[in-house]
Amino acid sequence: MRPIFTGSPSIVQGGFNLDVENQHFAVGDTVPAGTLAIKDEVKRTVQVIKTAKVVEVDAENTKKVSLYVDEFYEPCFAVGDLVLKDGTAATAIADVPTIEKIERNGNNYVVVLSKAIAGLAKDDVLVEVVSDGQAAAKSKERGTSNSVLIADVEVGEFETSVDVSADTMQYAMYERRVPPIPAGQKDTTGDYLKGN
């Protein structure tokens, strides 16, 4: 594993598990270290902020989107995830594309969407969104991160234990070495996380 932290993160004591009841994961996938997370101290569960950088949008089929992969990182999207371009305003859930298929082949990671995302281009960030639960449901961010995954986590068939940091402030991360951080997770300066 390459270094992603500039110091030693403070690990939250006690067991946490990935919240597979409220978030989709594919068994065998790896959630990369440095992924922003939302820990629930009461339920002892963790949800993650799923993001990926766009490498290419297929010119002939704009529903096919290639995402960035390297030797240390692969996105952790799952079939059924709702996704939008980072920075998109709240959108009617009926108009939000879902991931219908994921194609992996070596260093290629392609998602096939239920509908194209207008204006999506190379270097944009794709981010998972959720419903706001209202009668006329619209998209919203999953939530504000309050921790970070300390190490890569392989998704298991049943419970998947996760080590997370105590918060997002006690140390710094190399931003280019972690999954893309959505603008909505940053403060007004763009240099710090809101959930500090």
Regions found by a protein language model. Name each.
Residues 1-196:
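Surface-exposed, low-hydrophobicity beta-strand/loop segments enriched in small/polar/acidic residues
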